[in-house]
């Protein structure tokens, strides 16, 4: 998804874009059929209750956590599912625990903050002075946005598990370091844009 989005933003003509997109769509089912564990993940996604103690266990426990949270949650540190019921509760399925402790309202507030961050990233990309900064800011924003959406879809059982963490929230070493570094780069581009605008205003005032 990220590669296709970056190619599109890079200005590739639509017919060439389709030449890449169509084989990629055809390759997805082939890649799923090649590995048995991918088929198991797909079957668990389609019907988790068919194997409630095996492949479907994680998704079922995730849905239990979200359902237990209700509208306003059970309260901070009052989650039950994180105590060895939900696997990877601190990483891939941290959103389920957030939903259990803070409820649907808490998840909505979290996603509102995510939308604000994505908006800031898009604005930074749009205000970039050069094409490289535009692509870099767009790439960082897309990585964050795509990972956030995919993680939410996995936790809610909308798509099969992918193993992607929730950026800036999930625990982890490499993923967290890379995400923080990416946000630092995005902030650097935003700051340079602000400095360029300030310099431009100063030059205009001097000319007047």
Question: What function would you assign to each model-found segment?
Answer:
Residues 9, 47-50, 67, 99, ...:
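Signal for well-folded cores of large energy- and translation-related assemblies
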Residues 35-39, 115-118, 122, 142, ...:
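Alpha-helical transmembrane segments of polytopic integral membrane proteins
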Residues 13-14, 52, 168-169:
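Interfacial loop-to-helix junctions that mark the boundaries of transmembrane helices
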Residues 149-208:
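A juxtamembrane structural motif centered on a specific transmembrane helix
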Residues 16-108, 128-136:
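Hydrophobic, glycine- and aromatic-enriched re-entrant/interface helices and adjoining loop segments
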Residues 1-5, 22-30, 105-116, 138, ...:
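Lipid-exposed faces of alpha-helical membrane segments in multi-pass integral membrane proteins
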